Amino acid sequence: MSKINLLLLCGGGSAEHDISLMSANYFETSLAKSEQFSVLRVELDKFGQYRTAAGDDCELTNSREIRFRDESKTPWPVDYVIPCIHGYPGETGDIQSYFNLIQLPYFGCESEASSNCFNKITAKMWFSALGIPNTPYIFLNQFDDAAIEQTQAALAQWGSIFVKAASQGSSVGCYKVDDSAKVAGVLKDAFGYAPYVIVEKTIKARELEVAVYEYNGEVVATVPGEIICDTNTFYTFDEKYAKNSKARTDVVAQHVSAEISEQIRAYAIKAFKGMKLRHLSRIDFFLTADNEILLNEINTFPGSTPISMFPKMLQNHGHDFTEYLSLVINGQLTAKS
């Protein structure tokens, strides 16, 4: 049986470029455990240039092959691609649109679902439409005096707010604000990351995460895990990825009742199915002291770094990551043929 030529595409050039490379390491190691795949790792930089791990400049062509700048190298046909890219252009749905155009099968959510989840405003509209509770918010489409006034009014009403660039991940362009004097500066910074900004009420709550993925034709939601920050603030980019981070993770959140856990999992599956996600996601919730459950956000290509929750929760649920990848990829290619 011939091997599947699998393109492992990573990087992307966004603020999460280096995190993508860390996740790609995990995918590469997992795929190497199977004899089904011939893997070519290619990094995409912020200028749209492709380069193999061996340092060869190349490009992905409309003929679904990797063509090398060194024309003495034979083009490498691509059967399947894993776009291991956090942020733009992976989780935004942009690169998936290209794969659809050239009819190249790929791992993960499709373009529209990715885009809907990555934009925090669109995502919250979907959550509400599906009847899933989420944090109170307003959204802004330009930085002007009216936006500053609206944000200050929200701060006065809610006491504390988060100002977030609507289309960024890993807490990039995200600011906690308690002082009205800082509103204008924070808004200016947030609009520097995205054309739309969302302002949310600060929720004092536990941060719970659920891995939701497809396995043998079923949508699986794990029991919630938990992020615990030593700083007792929100989970910043540095808290997530800095080597000296004091944040810790519990693969199974402690002191969560079976009833609450099942409700969170039900909401997670409802979001996954309702927003037509595919293959994998990590869905994050807040749980308040009054046991109020609020959907926070959906990650359509969750991190797979040494500290990331998704692979740990999948493994804790009894599923092997390599076997999971094999099932998804083979099932998809079989259906295509």
Curated annotation (Swiss-Prot):
Keyword Transcription regulation (UniProt): no
What cofactor does this one take?
Answer: Mg(2+); Mn(2+)
Coiled coil location: none
Q: Which GO terms describe its cellular component?
A: cytosol
Q: What is its EC number?
A: 6.3.2.4
| Pathway stated in the Swiss-Prot or TrEMBL entry | Cell wall biogenesis; peptidoglycan biosynthesis
EC class: ligase
Q: Where in the cell is it found?
A: Cytoplasm
Cofactor info, note text? Binds 2 magnesium or manganese ions per subunit.
Q: Which GO terms describe its molecular function?
A: ATP binding; D-alanine-D-alanine ligase activity; metal ion binding
Q: Where does ATP bind?
A: 154-209
Annotated positions binding Mg(2+) 2: E297, N299
Q: Does the keyword Zinc apply?
A: no
Q: Which UniProt keywords apply?
A: ATP-binding, Cell shape, Cell wall biogenesis/degradation, Cytoplasm, Ligase, Magnesium, Manganese, Metal-binding, Nucleotide-binding, Peptidoglycan synthesis
Its catalytic activity? 2 D-alanine + ATP = D-alanyl-D-alanine + ADP + phosphate + H(+)
Function in brief:
Cell wall formation.
Write down what this protein is called. D-alanine--D-alanine ligase
- What is the originating organism of this protein? Shewanella baltica (strain OS185)
